[in-house]
């Protein structure tokens, strides 16, 4: 019984997030931990003059204006 209780305590401590941190995908690759005031991830699709698609990704405090954009508020959701 003590072993089970100790296991539950250890698992709770390991899974407990002591501070809210949002992680988003960024450009050109990889991830970034957002600042405290940045509460959303975004993905913005931009068409270049050569008809190439450019994906801009990162953290933001408000969703960018316009079409071809997506915002979300959970970790790694802007893939």
Swiss-Prot record:
Tell me the disulfide pairings in this chain: 24-41, 34-59, 63-71, 72-77
Which InterPro entries does its entry note?
Snake_3FTx, Snake_toxin-like_sf
Question: What are the recorded GO MF terms, alphabetically?
Answer: toxin activity
Tissue-specificity statement: Expressed by the venom gland.
Q: What subcellular locations does the record give?
A: Secreted
Does the UniProt entry include the keyword Secreted? Answer: yes
Instruction: Recite the UniProt keywords alphabetically.
Output: Disulfide bond, Secreted, Signal, Toxin
CDD domains xref list: TFP_snake_toxin
Principal location: secreted
This protein's record includes keyword Isomerase: no
> What residue range is the signal peptide?
1-21
Q: A single GO CC term, please?
A: extracellular region
Its family?
Belongs to the three-finger toxin family. Short-chain subfamily.
What is the recorded name of this protein? Scutelatoxin
The lineage, from the top, is:
Eukaryota, Metazoa, Chordata, Craniata, Vertebrata
